[in-house]
Amino acid sequence: MMTSSNPTGNEISQLEPSEAARLRENGSILLDVRTNEEFIAGHIQDVVFITLSEIEARAHELDPEIPLIALCRAGGRSQAAAELLAARGFTVSNMSGGMQAWEAAGLDFVTSDGGPGEVI
C-alpha cells in the first residue's frame, strides 16, 4: 500500500485491486465515481455509484463510519474524489489503476444487465 499527499494534508492510501477486494470483504465500501456510460458498460457488483461530478452534492448519502475505496477507470478521478471526501472527514483510499487494473487482475465485474463487463 502506498500513500499520496494532497493539498488538504490528508494522505490517501493507494490500494492494489486485490487489496481493495479483500477490504471490501471485510466491510469497506467500493465507491465508483465514473460516468453513467462507463458504469453501465462494466462495474463491480454491489458498489456505490456516485459520479465524480455529484460527489459534493451526494456525500451525505455515505456513512462516514464505513471506510471507502474510491475507483474510476484509471485512478485519477477517484483520487480527486478521495481527496474531497477525506477533507470532509471520511476514511477513504484510492484503488490504484482503477477498473483497468481490476480487469487486468482477473477480478469479476458485470454490465448493468448482469453480463460480462467491459472497461471503456
Language-model features: where?
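Rhodanese-like catalytic fold shared by cysteine-dependent sulfurtransferases
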Residues: 1-29, 36-67, 76-120
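Short, surface-exposed ligand- or partner-binding patches at beta-edge/loop junctions that are enriched
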Residues: 71
